[in-house]
Amino acid sequence: MSDSKLADSLNCLSVSTPSTTANPGRQQLLRLAVSNQRQVNNVSLANGKENKRTSNSKFNSSLRKIEEPIAGVPSSAGPQWREFHIGMFEIGKPLGKGKFGRVYLAKEKKTGFIVALKTLHKSELVQSKIEKQVRREIEIQSNLRHKNILRLYGHFHDEKRIYLILEFAGRGELYQHLRRAKRFSEEVASKYIFQMANALSYLHKKHVIHRDIKPENILLGIDGEIKLSDFGWSVHAPSNRRTTLCGTLDYLPPEMVEGKEHTEKVDLWSLGVLTYEFLVGAPPFEDMSGHSATYKRIAKVDLKIPSFVPPDARDLISRLLQHNPEKRMSLEQVMRHPWIVKYKDSWTRKSSESS
């Protein structure tokens, strides 16, 4: 696909695939505005100066404008879409770098609304033949509304780049927190796994399979809550089984390693791998001798859980890392598991005290 065809595809996406989700009510807008205001007061752009406090009314106004193109709500005069452009934003420090572009802290100039602006180079997307993957990411993520899923407010493009306007996750990548901590405490890990299960339950009810769960694709919000991101490998699969090999090697389930059909239950396996890595500090099937050895360990479910992992957490991990997808613990069971319940009161109380 040429750059021009990619541009045409994105233009079609803007009009033909609006979200069917209704605009949020005033109270939800206010909560989002207050949350963003807290982040404005705690971050700085490239000049290193703190941003000035912006009123709730301005934030509400900003959110209403951002919501319209996402929700696909036409004005009274007809389907007139709000056009975003790069000149609307003050670009700040880089937040991350990927293979095809970067993510920057940015501020909408008129309102002071803080976002993360993801830039993708069209030529590199075309060269790597992942245009459909990007389109799919936009289609899926723009329709999602969940507190533990990173929000996509909108998108636009120019001659060379595609820009995704994303929710700013104030505490950054979960992977970096895990690296610094080596491994998480049971209380912290159980909170994150509960929130992940909650987010995945929402996705699966919408027939969305994430397929690339790993610490690098999870961010933390300003209150330390999980924000699942990176929907490039996600699919909307209402009824069909899929055979595409995708995702990250350490997190691939046996059915994908073996080239078999797979369903949303691949995300259950990945949740088990994630639980293990949170508590141990490394994925369970990683083999330093190479990819082939890792594939074999996954296919055999060669699982060795260290003795310091408590029995109830071992039970959760073992019941998610089942070779047969149908035998894996459901997300509802995960959220009610004794290991989760044991710590839930503690992190729920701490969350309410900090809010």
UniProtKB/Swiss-Prot annotation:
Domain Protein kinase: start-end pairs: 89-340
Active site as annotated: D212
InterPro entries: Aur-like, Kinase-like_dom_sf, Prot_kinase_dom, Protein_kinase_ATP_BS, Ser/Thr_kinase_AS
GO biological process, one term: attachment of meiotic spindle microtubules to kinetochore
Cellular component, GO annotation: chromosome passenger complex; chromosome, centromeric region; chromosome, telomeric region; cytoplasm; inner kinetochore; kinetochore; meiotic spindle; meiotic spindle midzone
Positions with a binding annotation for ATP: L95, G96, K97, G98, K99, F100, G101, R102, V103, K118
Keyword field: ATP-binding, Cytoplasm, Cytoskeleton, Kinase, Nucleotide-binding, Nucleus, Serine/threonine-protein kinase, Transferase
Domain of life where this protein originates: Eukaryota
Subcellular compartments: Nucleus; Cytoplasm, Cytoskeleton, Spindle
EC numbers, comma separated: 2.7.11.1
Pfam families, per database record: Pkinase
Gene3D superfamilies: Transferase(Phosphotransferase) domain 1
Catalytic activity: L-seryl-[protein] + ATP = O-phospho-L-seryl-[protein] + ADP + H(+); L-threonyl-[protein] + ATP = O-phospho-L-threonyl-[protein] + ADP + H(+)
SMART domains: S_TKc
GO molecular function, a single term: histone H3S10 kinase activity
Assembly mode: Component of the CPC complex at least composed of ark1, bir1 and pic1. Interacts with the mitotic checkpoint complex (MCC) subunit mad3.
Family that this chain belongs to: Belongs to the protein kinase superfamily. Ser/Thr protein kinase family. Aurora subfamily.
Function field: Component of the chromosomal passenger complex (CPC), a complex that acts as a key regulator of chromosome segregation and cytokinesis. Has a role in error-correction of aberrent kinetochore-microtubule attachments to ensure that sister kinetochores become bioriented and connect to opposite poles by promoting spindle assembly checkpoint signaling. Ark1 is also required for phosphorylation of histone H3 that accompanies chromosome condensation and condensin recruitment to mitotic chromatin.
PANTHER family in alphabetical order: SERINE/THREONINE-PROTEIN KINASE IAL-RELATED
Protein name according to UniProt: Aurora kinase
